[in-house]
Amino acid sequence: ATDAIASSAVTTTVLAVNPVPWARAQMAFTLAFHIILVPLGVSWAFMTLIANYRAVKHGDRDALMLAQRWSKYMAVTFAVGAVTGTVLSFEFGLLWPRFMGQWGAAFGVPFAFEGLFFFTEAIFVAIYIFGWRRLRPWPHFWTGVPVVLAGIGGSVSVVAANAWMNAPSGFTQNAEGTVVAVDPLRVIFNDAMPLQAAHMVVAAYLVVNVIVIGYELFELWRQPAVIAAWKNAVFAAHGGSPMMVLK
C-alpha cells in the first residue's frame, strides 16, 4: 500500500510539474498509428476503382476479383482510420485547450471541411461495399467515385490545417490576440498548403502501389504460375511509376 501511495504521489508530481511532454507523447502515439492508415484509406479506394473500371469496361474477371478483394481492405482501413481520427479530434481540445481557445476559430476551418468529406466518404463506402451484387456494374462503379474524391478532399483538408500552422493566414485578431474574423479560403489555401498537400497525396498512392507490388511479387515467388499475380503486379506498377516520378 505504501509503495502504491508513493508511486501515485510521484506520478501526480510529474504531471503537476509539466504535463506538456505527456500530452505530446499521447498525441504522437495516436498520430503515429493514424498516419499508417491514412495513405491506405485514401489510396485503396482509387486502386479499387481503377480495377473495377477495367472489370466493367473490358470484362476482365481477374480485375473484378481484385476490385472486390481490395474493396474489403478499403472498408477496413477506412473504419479503423475513422476511429483513430475521432480520437485525434478530441485530443486537440483536451490536450491543447489554450491553443484551440486562441486559434480554434481559424484552425478549425479545414477540419470542418474534413468532416463534410468524411461523412460523404462514409455514406458512399457503405453503398459501394453492399452494392456489389445489388447494383448494375456501371451505377455501382460510379458510387465509388465520391469515395475517391472525398478521401482526397479529406486528406487535403487535414494537411491544410497542418500547413496553416506553418504559414498562418486568413484571420484577424483583436487587441487581446483572440481571432475575431476568419477568411476560410485564405486559411485553407495558405502558402504552405499546395506543396504539403501534393506531397501527402502522391506519397499515399505510392505507398499502396509499393505494398501491392511487394505482395504480388511475393505470391509469384511462392507460385510462379499464378497469372493473376502477374497481372496485379503489372497493374500496380503502372499506377506507381508516375507517382514515383512525381515524388
Language-model region placement:
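Polytopic transmembrane helical bundles with strong interfacial aromatic enrichment
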Residues: 2-247
